[in-house]
Amino acid sequence: EVHLGHNYLLSSFMSPNLNKRRDRYGGNTSGRAEFPRRVLGRIREAVGDQVAVTAKFNMADGVPKGLWLDESLQIAQWLEADGNLDALQLTGGSSLLNGMYFFRGEVPMAEFVAAQPKLVGYGLKIYGPRIFPTYPFEEAFFLPMARQFREALSMPLILLGGICIFVYRQVS
């Protein structure tokens, strides 16, 4: 599995919020997708058909000026056309900028504060609610976005995000 999500390295290239490059790997959607696409191509070249190559992929970064559905759908279509992936694992959020977008539910602020040195914990008490917005949990919270990917792609898709009961495993 290649990690193209949560604003880790390859995902950061695709995010307009984080990628401020002015060379061939920045700028428009195509430029920002270039480096991850090249990496996937080299991986496929190295392993051939002997290993399934899948990618965890952000449908949305969950941050202002980040990667959102329109661009992520376009990139996913390019990834499928490239033919270097056997499946796409759909997710969203930014470990760097908005971790709760993926986890959903009530923010465990007391636990965050308790795990930090005293001064950092004090800062979290004051600024934590601004840093960690709350997103209500609901079953299969990424399913509405994933359905748009299903309509646009023919490759196998795997869905993350609140898959807690068997019914959602069937429809996703």
Predicted features by range, described:
Residues 1-172:
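Flavin-dependent oxidoreductase catalytic cores
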